[in-house]
UniProtKB/Swiss-Prot annotation:
GO terms for cellular component: cytosol. The lineage of its organism: Bacteria, Pseudomonadati, Pseudomonadota, Gammaproteobacteria, Alteromonadales. Its cofactor is [2Fe-2S] cluster; Mg(2+). HAMAP family: IlvD (MF_00012). The keyword Iron-sulfur applies. This is Dihydroxy-acid dehydratase. The modification N6-carboxylysine is found at residue 124.
Amino acid sequence: MPKLRSATSTEGRNMAGARALWRATGVKDNDFGKPIIAIANSFTQFVPGHVHLKDMGSLVASAIEEAGGIAKEFNTIAVDDGIAMGHGGMLYSLPSRELIADSVEYMVNAHCADALVCISNCDKITPGMLMAALRLNIPVVFVSGGPMEAGKTKLSDKLIKLDLVDAMVAGADSNVSDEDSAKIERSACPTCGSCSGMFTANSMNCLTEALGLSLPGNGSMLATHADRRELFLEAGRRVMALAKRYYHQDDESALPRNIANFKAFENAMTLDIAMGGSSNTVLHLLAAAQEADVDFTMADIDRMSRLVPHLCKVAPSTPKYHMEDVHRAGGVMGILGELDRAGLLHTDVFHVAADNDGTPGSGTLKSVLAQYDVMQTQDEKVKHFFMAGPAGIPTTKAFSQDCRWPSLDNDRQEGCIRSREFAFSQEGGLAVLSGNVAENGCIVKTAGVDESNLTFVGSARVYESQDDAVAGILGGEVVAGDVVVIRYEGPKGGPGMQEMLYPTSYLKSRGLGKACALITDGRFSGGTSGLSIGHVSPEAAAGGTIALIENGDRIEIDIPKRSIKLAVSDVELNARREKMHSLGPMAWKPIGRQRYVSLALKAYAMLATSADKGAVRDRSKLED
């Protein structure tokens, strides 16, 4: 029977000092011997997805203590990618993922916690905590802050839904009046919560449901809705149940590595492809798989992208649907239910929402779907749960409203979530491309690509940084038919693998959204749409071919064939590579780029791998 990890610091005379310190935190004599449950919160006043999390730890703690545990909360950092966008702050976003993972590991291991609840929400926080949870492999439950309500405003006597990207595009479009731009800006982000579309934050919070590590509704229930309160309380109860199963019953199915196994990662990626999730999720799933010692790679993603249909189309891929609409249609469980009926899901994997009593099928995703898939459940409480909707009242307070949709969206032919027969497309919303530009692959969010752009041939317009590309786009250098190439923005070359939301938004604002393509060894915001190809691997700084592209080179993109090709002969490419090598210390570095890189970022860059490895640390450099 496993011994409580916390016994290391609470048992024996030699731990008298540690017990004295535990007492100073409020632990009583009769508490010693109870499991200590760490609560990793990410409250901050910098991020709308996190401004309402201050009291969430107390909610979780109350449920833990009622169930017989000791709850101890700590905080991690949280970077807002939208606020950090378009300037040097974005260099810190992806590296913060590793910092968050390390900080959770440090706190949990330093204090010998027995189990963990992760209160996350936005872009790098959920992935960072996920990496830590799989690294630690102690009982864990994830509960996020939830998505914000979609913005709404009236323009030309028409009510339209909005999000952050609409504000950015309007602000850069000279054809939009100052008055209309201001209306959009003030209406785009009306409440607390993660941005309202299927951007990175919401994509990752949905994927934790598919991985089996969070409760149904975690990815889709609005931050403002009163029903979300129960998710925090249930997270506390569930983590205690998992801890008891592991420490009292020696049930290893309660551990995250036995829940988030290879099949669960396939489920998560299947969901991601079906819902057209952010391309960043590929980066984060690959990183999490490495922490879990799961052999899940770009090759698996490529294979699955050819099999999984696109069942759910959400902003930024369409202005019609946001996360509040996904929830009304049954949330993640609704999408998983359709995937199951299409024969594309592993339902025999364990899930934290299911009790494992030892009987066949218990504790698995199959039993969770039977209860929470709105197309098969007979539970009226579940149907009521998924009818939770927006109030349309600007607020930064959680649980501030209890509005309901008049009905569920069960229309699987023309609704927000479709059955396989009526899919938005029979190929999913993400694809892996490869070719001489990206020998180890690159990613495109096909959900956001217009059908007319599935194949594209154009001339390279090369920039050594995102800043130069933005200046070139706004300055009129980029014209229809160009393939904008932004390089030296990968994990090592940036460093930090910046998001390219401004270049793609500015292309749209200049009417070039469908007339140009963009490829980069950087990445894209979850809010990006259009022919935007990122994660080119190897990156320029690691000797990738993207560093050898010259202005005017012909680039051929064929998404149906999963191909991206630089139409330059091997002889010429080899000559360019030799010329690059001849530069010595200046080889594989951006020409003329002026950028301050701090010591912290330089330390990150020294160990960073390319995107096809999840941009995690190169373990070979850390081995004894």
